[in-house]
């Protein structure tokens, strides 16, 4: 993708976050971001003006909603079991200055279970559980090129805390 200098742009936004613990083992997290970023003065050529267009690669809205439930057994070899689920969303995004190509809002649903045994944590996880189609990047040159986001995936991780 080619980045060009624009005459003048403006970006304003706000981000809010909330953490709640309605009962001891349950933690809920919510965050929301709003960004309004546009070109105030961008004359590409004598006949083409991008003044007033939205800045490329800047989503208008971002959203994250996560919940985790922690179980701490009183006996046994497991120190902690954490079950978590999260939804991450990205609002409409324009891929270049002309604002002709965009991606609408999408959300990814992820989940994870992790068990901790002393210095070792074993995780089972799933990402993009709804198999949402989305692009992580797009640009147009002599042809259009895009990078698709990852499809639904499952995996496991083994973490050693040394």
Predicted regions and their residues:
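Flexible, surface-exposed loop regions and adjacent strand-edge segments
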Residues: 1-2, 41-53, 99-104, 138-147
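Gram-negative outer-membrane beta-barrel transporters
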Residues: 4-96, 157-161
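Short, basic/aromatic-rich helical patch in the C-terminal catalytic core of site-specific tyrosine
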Residues: 16, 111-113
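Surface-exposed coil/turn segments at beta-strand junctions on protein surfaces, enriched
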Residues: 21-23, 58, 104, 115, ...
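Transmembrane beta-barrel architecture of outer membranes
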Residues: 60-64, 106-110, 149-155
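C-terminal beta-signal and adjacent terminal beta-strands/loops
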Residues: 88-96, 114-162
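Outer-membrane beta-barrel transmembrane domain signature
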Residues: 90, 102-107
């Amino acid at each position: 993708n080619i980045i060009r200098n624009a005459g003048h742009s403006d970006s304003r936004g706000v981000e809010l976050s909330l953490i709640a613990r309605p009962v001891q083992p349950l933690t809920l997290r919510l965050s929301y971001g709003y960004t309004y970023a546009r070109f105030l003065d961008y004359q590409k050529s004598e006949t083409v003006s991008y003044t007033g267009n939205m800045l490329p690669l800047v989503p208008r809205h971002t959203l994250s909603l996560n919940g985790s439930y922690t179980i701490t057994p009183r006996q046994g070899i497991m120190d902690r079991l954490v079950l978590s689920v999260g939804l991450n969303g990205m609002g409409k995004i324009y891929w270049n200055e002309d604002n002709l190509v965009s991606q609408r809002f999408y959300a990814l649903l992820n989940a994870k279970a992790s068990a901790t045994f002393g210095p070792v944590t074993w995780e089972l996880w799933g990402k993009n559980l709804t198999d949402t189609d989305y692009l992580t990047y797009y640009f147009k040159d002599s042809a259009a090129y895009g990078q698709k986001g990852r499809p639904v995936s499952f995996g496991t991780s083994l973490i050693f805390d040394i």
